[in-house]
Amino acid sequence: MEKRSELYRGKAKTVYHTDDPNRLVLEFRNDTSAFDGEKVEQLDDKGMVNNKFNHFIMSKLEEAGIPTQLDERLSDTESLVKKLDMIPVECVVRNVAAGSLVRRLGVEEGKELNPPTFEFFLKNDALHDPMVNEYHIQAFGWATAEQIEKMKELTFKVNDVLKALFADAGLLLVDYKLEFGVFDGEIMLGDEFTPDGCRLWDAETREKLDKDRFRQGLGGVVEAYREVAKRLGVTLD
């Protein structure tokens, strides 16, 4: 497998073509951003931590029967992935009230949600990722009704698997976002699962161990990511 030209450069990852038209290289960079790119910093080792963390989580999900784009980890900061036809919506599940849900609905942060809530958001930085519903998604041709149901099914299956995994490590999976795409006609989990795209709290102290440390200026971002990885048994060094 040969890495070739850059296909896309996002806020924290770069995607490269390879000599296989069905495979891409996903590079995790040290760039860290928040508020649709308004706040950006470089954090040492973050790319390495997120790449290894993502490989660990995706492998656990594959073991649970959830198809993902991940093929293999190539280096400290790069992974080989399938080239998915991405669906331009984010699937968000919330187990505990935090973030935009608190701001939108005026509920107390930390309130446990039973059942968990599910929301769709359009991936569009210029519009600040607006919330959309199933009717929007079908009307604008972003996904079919069948694909929507499959994304919801897989998103909740991820919740079952990861809530238990994190709970065993003394962590509370507050919320997370997932992105899906199509490969050979099958819906698969794409993008990443790292502390950049979920909220994780210490189950006892409620200490935040995710990107909210960056958003809220709490410091110790990579240290928190390392702590989560250590509790899960992710080998970093």
Curated annotation (Swiss-Prot):
InterPro entries: SAICAR_synt/ADE2_N, SAICAR_synt_PurC, SAICAR_synth, SAICAR_synthetase, SAICAR_synthetase_CS. One of its GO terms (biological process) is 'de novo' IMP biosynthetic process. The keyword rRNA-binding does not apply. Pathway: Purine metabolism; IMP biosynthesis via de novo pathway; 5-amino-1-(5-phospho-D-ribosyl)imidazole-4-carboxamide from 5-amino-1-(5-phospho-D-ribosyl)imidazole-4-carboxylate: step 1/2. PROSITE patterns: SAICAR_SYNTHETASE_1, SAICAR_SYNTHETASE_2. Keywords: ATP-binding, Ligase, Nucleotide-binding, Purine biosynthesis. It comes from the Bacteria. GO terms for molecular function: ATP binding; phosphoribosylaminoimidazolesuccinocarboxamide synthase activity. Its EC number is 6.3.2.6. It is an enzyme of class 6 (ligase). It catalyses: 5-amino-1-(5-phospho-D-ribosyl)imidazole-4-carboxylate + L-aspartate + ATP = (2S)-2-[5-amino-1-(5-phospho-beta-D-ribosyl)imidazole-4-carboxamido]succinate + ADP + phosphate + 2 H(+). Pfam families: SAICAR_synt. HAMAP family: SAICAR_synth. Belongs to the SAICAR synthetase family. This is Phosphoribosylaminoimidazole-succinocarboxamide synthase. It comes from Idiomarina loihiensis (strain ATCC BAA-735 / DSM 15497 / L2-TR). The gene is purC.
